[in-house]
């Protein structure tokens, strides 16, 4: 009887350790998901800014071309 109680305690300890580890991994996953969402938002914003800069540069180059043609 003593042996099976010891085995049960070891099993209980391993299960608790696994549960604790899973809880930590879930918290880490939640943090990574949140960080990923922030990075996706930042990426989207930077892409929009990049497009806006490209449009402004094209407009400026167009004006320079018009000036060159009128000279």
From Swiss-Prot:
GO terms for biological process: division septum assembly; FtsZ-dependent cytokinesis. Residues 5-67 form a coiled coil. InterPro entries: Cell_div_ZapB. Homodimer. The ends of the coiled-coil dimer bind to each other, forming polymers. Interacts with FtsZ. Non-essential, abundant cell division factor that is required for proper Z-ring formation. It is recruited early to the divisome by direct interaction with FtsZ, stimulating Z-ring assembly and thereby promoting cell division earlier in the cell cycle. Its recruitment to the Z-ring requires functional FtsA or ZipA. Belongs to the ZapB family. This is Cell division protein ZapB.
């Amino acid at each position: 009887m003593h042996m099976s109680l010891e085995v049960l305690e070891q099993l209980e300890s391993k299960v608790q350790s696994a549960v604790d580890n899973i809880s930590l991994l879930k918290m880490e996953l939640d943090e990574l998901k949140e960080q990923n969402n922030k990075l996706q938002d930042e990426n989207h914003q930077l892409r929009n800014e990049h497009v806006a800069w490209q449009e402004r540069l094209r407009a400026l180059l167009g004006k320079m071309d018009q000036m060159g043609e009128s000279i």
